């Protein structure tokens, strides 16, 4: 059997693959051995004496199946863990994600005029100070603040209305008393005139 090392190298160059992927027909070794140029190798490829082997199948089916199981929480117990909790899910990354979510929410609320810039600033600093565990708690806090603000405004309006009402009542009472005084003075002066 003749050495076909040259032919294999030329074929791998022509087919643009590794030498392992080149198949030379064992029944036609003499004809292949005569080919010593790329042009002749191309002809042999065209005739089907030299073939590029297909890519070896490396199935990901099992891997996909395991990934789906892991999403459900399987194979993730204490015995399967190698790194520390911080190595598996860094605290800094969790913090960054939380801050970005909270700050995005605050920005949107400010742009939509749901909160004013003063409330935005105080809530921004509170978020930075680790007051809000997640988005839901921040939203609930904002709703509570707004409700308190509305209630205070309502109470203030009611108190103001009560004050104006009492002020007007006092004014009316004073006017009535003044009118009564004037009437009494008039009647007294008339009586004095009649006596004279």
Curated annotation (Swiss-Prot):
Locate the compositionally biased regions of type Basic and acidic residues: 159-196
Q: Does the keyword Ribosomal protein apply?
A: yes
Q: Kindly list the biological process annotations in GO that this record carries.
A: hemopoiesis; translation
InterPro entries, alphabetized: 60S_ribosomal_eL19_sf, Ribosomal_eL19, Ribosomal_eL19_CS, Ribosomal_eL19_dom, Ribosomal_eL19_dom1, Ribosomal_eL19_euk
Entries under SMART domains matching the protein = Ribosomal_L19e
Which keywords belong to this entry? Cytoplasm, Ribonucleoprotein, Ribosomal protein
Q: Name one GO molecular function term.
A: structural constituent of ribosome
| Compartments, record wording | Cytoplasm
One cellular component term (GO) for this entry is:
cytosolic large ribosomal subunit
Where do the segments described as Disordered lie? 156-196
Xref: Gene3D superfamilies? 1.10.1200.240, 1.10.1650.10
UniProt family annotation:
Belongs to the eukaryotic ribosomal protein eL19 family.
Subunit structure comment from the entry: Component of the large ribosomal subunit.
Q: Which NCBIfam families match?
A: PRK08570.1
Q: What does this protein do?
A: Component of the large ribosomal subunit. The ribosome is a large ribonucleoprotein complex responsible for the synthesis of proteins in the cell.
Q: Mind telling me which HAMAP family this protein's record contains?
A: Ribosomal_eL19
> What's this protein's name?
Large ribosomal subunit protein eL19
Q: Which organism is it from?
A: Danio rerio
